[in-house]
Design a protein with these regions (language model features):
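Cytosolic/stromal cytosol-facing helical appendages immediately following the last transmembrane segment
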Residues: 2-5, 21-38, 47-62, 90-165
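Interfacial segments of alpha-helical transmembrane regions
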Residues: 3-11, 78-94
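Alpha-helical interaction segments
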Residues: 12-14, 118-119
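N-terminal Rossmann-like or analogous alpha/beta NTP/dinucleotide-binding catalytic cores
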Residues: 42
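Membrane-helix exit/interface motif
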Residues: 49-56, 72-82
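Core segments of transmembrane alpha-helices
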Residues: 61-79, 145
């Protein structure tokens, strides 16, 4: 039982880390004029940073298709190539990264279960995520949980990968 719980937690944190790296990449390198990804991701991401609530106005599918489609393709690849179940579960969690991010902008509108998960520190709270939208704007890229951001921010991870790239 403990092994299963640990497996779920680690898969969730792995998904949060992957989502954080992609979020950093979007913020750092994409805009609406970027070939291929500009219209799908760059433009909406820029809009989100000028109007944090804009992406809440669309449907579930409109808000999440950019994470659902690649995640489901990755899940399919995991099943086809007999990958471990932790990879499959990580991509399943990752498919919901934008939705969990949306909940981080929806204080008082998330229902009791999501609100409780935010209060307990399982899901990222609105207060935690708000730090990403304040100066200096280069912290708190992981959008699913509050667990990884303090560590990654403290060790300068985002500045390090900026240097590497």
């Amino acid at each position: 039982m403990i092994e299963w719980i640990l497996f779920v937690i680690l898969s969730f944190l792995a998904a949060d880390f992957i989502a954080g790296v992609f979020h950093w990449w979007e913020d750092s390198y994409l805009d609406q004029d970027t070939p291929i990804f500009g219209r799908l991701i760059g433009g909406p991401n820029q809009l989100h940073h000028s109007d944090q609530y804009a992406f809440l106005k669309g449907s579930y599918w409109h808000r999440n298709y950019t994470t659902i489609i690649p995640s489901m393709l990755a899940c399919g690849a995991c099943l086809c190539f007999d990958a471990t179940q932790d990879a499959w579960l990580t991509f399943l969690f990752l498919s919901q990264a934008n939705q969990i991010h949306a909940w981080g902008h929806s204080k008082g509108k998330n229902g009791w279960l999501v609100s409780m998960a935010q209060r307990c520190g399982i899901l990222q709270s609105c207060k935690h995520h708000a730090e990403h939208h304040r100066s200096p704007y280069h912290i708190r890229y992981c959008v699913m949980s509050p667990m990884l951001n303090p560590i990654l921010d403290a060790i300068g991870f985002w500045r390090y990968i900026e240097y590497v790239v």
